[in-house]
Amino acid sequence: MKIAILSDIHSNIFALEAVIAHFKRKSVDMVVNLGDILYGPIAPQATYERLRALEDEFNVVTIRGNQDRQIYEADEAELESNPTMAFIHEDLTSDAMDWMRALPFDRQLTDYLYLCHGTPDNDLIYLLEDVSS
């Protein structure tokens, strides 16, 4: 089974379209989206709509990232102090917000494939490698 893995789209519809074209050429069987989908100043609603349309073409599994959660948890103070967040809230429909809220934190896809954004316990912790010679 060929699985295309997406992550950290950050509302970049243009990059998303290029990636979709690539994995269509590769004849993938499934698309896995690891979150951080709509936070960004480019095109949150258009990105949401494209991803939902992708579900008509492929078996798509999506989990939420930390910034997806931060979008629907944003309060008035955050919207006033963060122009990007304010733009996202203005751009997204209630359907898009509801979709994000419903995304799971993680998913056990198979016996050997576990999906999460960050670590299994915390979506704010980054897995970083310290590579030395």
Language-model features and meaning:
Residues L79-S133:
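Acidic, His/Gly-enriched loop-helix segments that form or flank divalent-metal centers
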Residues K2-M97:
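Core catalytic region of metal-dependent phosphoesterases/phosphodiesterases
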